[in-house]
Amino acid sequence: MPKMKTHRGAAKRFRKTGTGKLKRGKAFRSHILTKKSSKTKRHLRKAGYVSDSQLKVMKKLLPYL
């Protein structure tokens, strides 16, 4: 059986934490920021985590992460 391939786009966007969760950056942070409040932009700086329902799909995309 051939080696499993890592999805390179996903590998650039996710990092594994010590407990096995997947950490991700948040969207809506690159441009058109003038209409967003300071509070919204501050919350977008914080890391997000992949939900438990999506974790199984992500493990297939990132078998060696």
From Swiss-Prot:
Pfam families: Ribosomal_L35p (PF01632). One of its GO terms (biological process) is translation. Disulfide bonds: none annotated. GO terms for cellular component: cytosolic large ribosomal subunit. It comes from the Bacteria. Residues 1-26 are annotated as: Disordered. GO terms for molecular function: structural constituent of ribosome. Belongs to the bacterial ribosomal protein bL35 family. This is Large ribosomal subunit protein bL35. It comes from Clostridium beijerinckii (strain ATCC 51743 / NCIMB 8052) (Clostridium acetobutylicum).
